Curated annotation (Swiss-Prot):
One of its GO terms (cellular component) is cytoplasm. It comes from Pseudomonas savastanoi pv. phaseolicola (strain 1448A / Race 6) (Pseudomonas syringae pv. phaseolicola (strain 1448A / Race 6)). Belongs to the CheB family. Residues 148-183 have a biased composition (Low complexity). The gene is cheB2. It is an enzyme of class 3 (hydrolase). The lineage of its organism: Bacteria, Pseudomonadati, Pseudomonadota, Gammaproteobacteria, Pseudomonadales. Keywords: Chemotaxis, Cytoplasm, Hydrolase, Phosphoprotein. This is Protein-glutamate methylesterase/protein-glutamine glutaminase 2. The modification 4-aspartylphosphate is found at D55. The active site is at S211, H238, D331.
Length: 387
């Protein structure tokens, strides 16, 4: 069954080009277009698309307001188009808070001169978002909750961590690779327990990797951590260079722990989360120092979860607690394999709470996950495991 898409943009040129690009994919059909947020709501109610592409700056009603209304009235995955500026980043993060699932840079030059590149990225995202939404029955409730949630505060005061009801972990059987060091071999029990309480350990580092759906997921996890959280954290979110600084600033305002965009030479310390800068790679060494490297064009992801996880395995051995959250693709799987070989712990987000069950699924299918947790429980379990 073809994916039904509603295209929303006040630019006639952009609307036509996006429609042409999507229509060239045999798995996608554009069922309608809209020129502003008000029309988008009307068309969404009438056409019931599987996915909506949405501009944010439009007359009559902006994209963020439209997303909030859509999530409350007819929850539908929304892919935002955003300008690659600091202000564009701020607005895009507001849209993700409102319930949008992902975003793409709005680049008129690319869509004019390099439509094949845009087609590959846009169609891949549309198809992945649609597949994930069809698998999951929880999108509507989660999206409505996002739309009803208050916007991010503008003050720099630390926000109180939300409380969540305990939920059961679903540990998975893990086979340690044959190359794992014998002293650090990590095996799952033959009959895994269903207890929600993770094993406590003196972790020296918590490493979290994510992609599509990650901004909201990271916010949900990190706001549950106390200021006294005893381990340093490194965060790897697939995101353009113009966005990561704004995202780190937003998290810092929302969380009790401190969050900043990582810089070369930063020192890891308890209660500080360092976010990998967009367009670059982040590594950690055994002295607790962060190294920021230029993005390698041979790698699909900049930043790349595998790169950071691999450096953590080399530098900290069995003292890393890694978490793979929602995201497309399989980034993080090979890094998690190295962590497992070193004896470290790997968690994955469960399918039901993922926007895109790609990266966590890769971990689970490779039998690398020590436990699978719902998004709402990961923050609480981090506290239980590390305190």
């Amino acid at each position: 069954m073809a994916v039904k898409v509603l295209v929303v943009d006040d630019s006639g040129f952009f609307r036509r080009r996006v429609t042409e690009i999507l229509s060239s994919d045999p798995n996608i059909v554009v069922v309608g277009t809209a020129t502003n947020g008000k029309e988008a709501i009307e068309q969404a109610l009438a056409l019931k698309p599987d996915v909506i592409t949405m501009d944010y700056e439009m007359p009559m009603m902006d994209g963020i307001t439209a997303v909030r209304h859509i999530m409350q009235r007819i929850p539908t995955p929304v892919l935002m188009f955003s300008s690659l500026t600091h202000e564009g980043a701020r607005v895009t993060l507001d849209a993700l808070d409102a319930g949008a699932v992902d975003f793409l840079p709005k680049n008129f030059e690319d869509i004019s001169r390099n439509p094949q590149k845009v087609k590959q990225l846009l169609c891949e995202k549309i198809n992945s978002i649609s597949r994930s939404n069809r698998r999951s029955s929880g999108f509507g409730a989660a999206s409505a909750a996002s739309a009803a949630a208050p916007a991010a505060p503008t003050s720099s005061s630390r926000a109180p961590a939300p409380t969540t009801a305990p939920a059961r972990a679903v540990p998975t059987r893990t086979a340690a690779p044959a190359t794992a060091p014998a002293a650090h071999a990590h095996h799952a029990p033959a009959h895994p327990t269903t207890s929600g309480t993770p094993k406590r350990k003196a972790y020296k580092l918590v490493a979290i990797g994510t992609s599509t759906g990650g901004p909201v997921a990271l916010q949900r996890v990190l706001t549950q951590l106390p200021a006294s959280f005893p381990a340093p954290l490194v965060l790897i979110q697939h995101m353009p260079a113009a966005f990561t600084k704004a995202f780190a600033e937003r998290l810092d305002k929302l969380c009790k722990i401190s969050v900043k965009e990582a810089e070369d030479g930063d020192v890891l310390r308890p209660g500080l989360a360092l976010l990998a800068p967009g367009g670059k790679q982040m590594m950690v060494d055994a002295r607790g120092t962060v190294k920021i490297l230029p993005g390698d064009e041979r790698l699909n992801y900049k930043p790349c979860v595998d790169i950071t996880f691999g450096s953590a395995a080399k530098s900290y051995g069995d003292k890393v607690l890694s978490v793979v959250l929602t995201g497309m693709g399989a980034d993080g799987r090979e890094g998690a394999r190295l962590l497992k070989q070193a004896g470290s712990t790997v968690w994955a987000q469960d399918e039901a709470s993922c926007v895109i069950y790609g990266m966590p699924m890769a971990i689970v299918k490779a039998e690398l996950a020590d436990a699978i947790y719902s998004l709402d429980d990961i923050g609480r379990h981090l506290v239980e495991a590390c305190l």
